[in-house]
């Protein structure tokens, strides 16, 4: 097993090196041919999202933006691209090392004119390299700053670590917080499970409530804490459990426009990382709630929508990820009532209400129980 893992890692490193060298070679050849160096990338805007019938997720369309040395800004971007490419090849891949996104920003301080002005700039460059190579950043040994979230439920896994294999049952062998999802979930193998569903939960409070109330045992549910906008590793493990094990997924968030985007990132992918949608998005994931109609039906405690909330909801009406009749009706209802609610609002009906009344009713309505 360890030999297979090592061989797979070496093949991945060789592929990443080959793809990164192709970028450098293209720029070098443009110089040789006395052509102004440039690279083209998909435009990362909402207007350039297209639905892929093949994969059922939203991906980038044909609109492109050019990074060209014709301008000073473009020349600096290409310079930084070559420095980063050289660093990833010679420091990460050649020496089997890795860095966080934050570390890369600080490492660039030694790159003279290629130094990044802010971390957002270095983050975007790594995303550019993902697009240009058609590889995920993990192939370059780049690690995110944030941890993956946690999960708790009836599934047994094997995780490959630097210290060998770990066999873990995600109910019996973990503490109250659950199993910590690693940043590279390709190191996980699923062994066996008794799960009938996955509930991906936005807030830590609701995740803890479902665990305390025994919802995982009562409904054979794998509970996944999204920790707000989910990390890549969280989205990836949800997709893998859905596709490889056939476990249906429901996403349970707060009832506001920002939370609907959390659902969209799980189901369809995020706008800024649409190049990874086919790898991370779970188009079969269903939106459980909290729905605007739930606010009305259960007379939940609410807050008034802010101007930013209203603007975000109106923006979602033109977002291709929310173009279904269901979403248009729910968003319009929320605009009409002018209210939003948190998951924890169900506590106003009693600590057991969400697990004994709301979730069973909603899951039956969705055909999941």
Swiss-Prot record:
EC number(s) for this protein? 5.6.2.2
* Record-linked CDD domains: TOPRIM_TopoIIB_SPO
Q: Where is the active site?
A: 106
| Gene Ontology CC, one term | chromosome
What's an example GO BP annotation here?
A: DNA topological change
For this chain, one GO molecular function annotation is: DNA binding
Which residues are in the Topo IIA-type catalytic domain? 11-149
Q: How does this protein assemble?
A: Homodimer. Heterotetramer of two Top6A and two Top6B chains.
List each coiled-coil range.
Answer: none
Keyword Calcium in annotation:
no
Please give the cofactor(s) recorded in the UniProt entry for this protein.
Mg(2+)
Which family does the record assign?
A: Belongs to the TOP6A family.
Protein name per UniProt: Type 2 DNA topoisomerase 6 subunit A
Transmembrane domains' residue ranges: none
**Catalyzed reaction equations:** ATP-dependent breakage, passage and rejoining of double-stranded DNA
Q: In its keyword annotation, does this UniProt entry include Phosphoprotein?
A: no
Free-text function comment from the UniProt entry? Relaxes both positive and negative superturns and exhibits a strong decatenase activity.
């Amino acid at each position: 097993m360890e030999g297979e893992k090592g061989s797979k890692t070496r093949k991945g490193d060789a592929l990443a090196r080959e793809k990164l060298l192709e970028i450098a070679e293209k720029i070098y050849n443009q110089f040789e041919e006395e052509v102004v160096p440039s690279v083209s990338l998909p435009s990362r805007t909402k207007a350039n999202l297209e639905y892929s019938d093949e994969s059922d997720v939203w991906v980038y369309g044909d609109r492109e933006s050019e990074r060209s040395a014709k301008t000073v800004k473009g020349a600096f971007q290409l310079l930084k691209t070559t420095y980063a490419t050289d660093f990833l090849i010679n420091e990460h891949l050649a020496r089997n090392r890795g860095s966080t996104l934050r570390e890369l920003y600080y490492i660039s301080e030694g790159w003279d004119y290629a130094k990044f002005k802010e971390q957002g700039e270095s983050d975007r460059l790594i995303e550019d390299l993902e697009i240009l190579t058609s590889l995920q950043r993990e192939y370059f040994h780049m690690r995110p700053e944030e941890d993956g979230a946690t999960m708790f439920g009836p599934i047994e896994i094997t995780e490959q670590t630097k210290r060998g294999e770990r066999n873990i049952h995600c109910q019996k062998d973990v503490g109250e917080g659950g199993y910590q999802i690693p940043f590279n979930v390709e190191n996980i193998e699923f062994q066996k499970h008794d799960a009938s569903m996955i509930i991906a939960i936005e807030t830590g409070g609701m995740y803890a409530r479902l665990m305390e109330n025994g919802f995982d045992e009562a409904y054979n549910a794998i509970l996944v804490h999204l920790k707000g906008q989910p990390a890549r590793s969280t989205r990836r493990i949800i997709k893998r459990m859905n596709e490889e094990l056939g476990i249906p997924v429901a996403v349970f968030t707060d009832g506001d426009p920002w939370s609907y985007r959390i659902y969209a990132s799980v189901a369809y992918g995020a706008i800024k990382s649409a190049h990874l949608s086919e790898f991370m998005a779970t188009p079969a994931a269903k939106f459980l709630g909290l729905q605007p109609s739930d606010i009305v039906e259960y007379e939940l405690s609410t807050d008034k929508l802010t101007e930013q909330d209203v603007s975000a909801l109106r923006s979602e009406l033109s977002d291709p990820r929310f173009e279904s009749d269901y979403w248009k009706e729910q968003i319009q209802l929320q605009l009409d009532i002018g209210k939003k609610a948190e998951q924890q609002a169900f506590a106003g009906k009693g600590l057991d209400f969400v697990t004994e009344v709301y979730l069973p009713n909603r899951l039956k309505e969705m055909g999941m129980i």
